[in-house]
Structures are given as C-alpha cells and as structure tokens.
C-alpha cells in the first residue's frame, strides 16, 4: 500500500517488500513442517494483499497442507465474506489490521484507503468465517479531537459487541 500518511516507506521492511508466489511459499511451508514439525505460521507482511492470500489459500488446499496461519492486512473491500471462508478453510485462524481511528475524516487524512463501514463489513466477514480479528488503533493523530477519540472508543465497543473484532490495542500516535 505504502500510502498511509504516517508510514515511513523508506524503511527497509516496507520499501524493499519482496513477494513470493503461492507455490514458493507452500514449498517453504512444507519444508519447515517436514524439518521441524512446526504447523503454525505468522506471516508478518505489513499488509498482505487479498490476491496473494487467496492464492496462498488455494495452494494450501490444493496440496492438502494442514497448518494454522495468521497475518496482517489492510481492511480492503476485496476481503469478501467468500474470501474469508476460503482463508479459514486453508487454516487461517486470525488477522490483524490497522483500523487506526474510527473516523472517516481522520482515515481520509491518514490516506488509509478504507472507511469505517468497510472495516466493519470486512471484520464481520472474517469473524463469521471463524477467523479472529485484532485491530490496531491509535489516538493523538493531528487534528484528532477529544470527541473523535470518544466516538472511536464507542465505535470499537460496538465492534466488540457485534462480534466483529475480538481484540484491539490502542497506542499513542507517533510518526515512523
């Protein structure tokens, strides 16, 4: 994505992102499982693309590789309920993503490329598929008011109440 206003895209782990095909990833997974017996994998991409995760899920299912896995995403609209079901079938147990703030005004200023409603729909799709959702949240973004923060807390409370997210972590805004 590399567009969020607070993200330092010059950092090596962001600017030098190197993709691997689903086939290569599953080759590596099979090798690790064979060598270590490890069957739990955390993919630590900053925001794994939906197409890449779909390809990974399809390859895991095609090869009948049984693992548990989780990763980090942006709450993109292409994470449909159908894709969430496919990911769950392939062993996905959790997703983490940056909701950041529950304010469309602030999300726009942040250039997150998502809306509050979109986040609610995507997280609900994951949760309905049995995938746990963790939301990263922040406070103190420039121009964020006390009322923005209060509204965000209430919205996050509703996301928990409606089963859209199962965990969340608030941190103070700081530029990277």
Describe the role of every protein-language-model region.
Residues 53, 105-110, 139-147, 163-176:
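Flexible glycine/acidic-rich beta-alpha junction loops that bind and position SAM and/or redox cofactors
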Residues 1-21:
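Canonical Radical SAM [4Fe-4S] cluster-binding loop centered on the CxxxCxxC motif
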Residues 16-24, 110-117, 144-148:
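Alpha-helix N-cap and loop-to-helix initiation/capping positions
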Residues 26-132:
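Conserved SAM/AdoMet-binding glycine-rich loop
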Residues 32-33, 158-160:
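An active-site-proximal structural segment forming one wall of the substrate-binding cleft
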């Amino acid at each position: 994505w590399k567009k969020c206003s607070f993200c330092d895209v010059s950092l090596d782990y962001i600017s030098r992102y190197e993709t691997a095909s689903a086939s290569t990833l599953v080759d590596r997974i099979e090798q690790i499982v064979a060598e270590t017996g490890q069957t739990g994998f955390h993919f630590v991409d900053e925001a794994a693309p939906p197409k890449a995760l779909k390809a990974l899920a399809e390859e895991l299912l095609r090869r009948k590789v049984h693992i548990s896995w989780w990763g980090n995403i942006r709450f993109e609209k292409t994470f449909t309920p159908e894709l969430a079901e496919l990911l769950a079938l392939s062993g996905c147990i959790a997703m983490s993503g940056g909701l950041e703030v529950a304010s469309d005004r602030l999300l726009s200023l942040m250039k997150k490329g998502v809306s509050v409603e979109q986040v609610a729909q995507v997280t609900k799709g994951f949760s309905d598929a049995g995938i746990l959702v963790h939301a990263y949240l922040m406070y103190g973004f420039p121009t964020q008011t006390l009322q923005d923060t209060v509204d965000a807390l209430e919205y996050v409370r509703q996301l928990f109440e409606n089963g859209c997210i199962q965990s969340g972590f608030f941190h103070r805004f700081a530029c990277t």
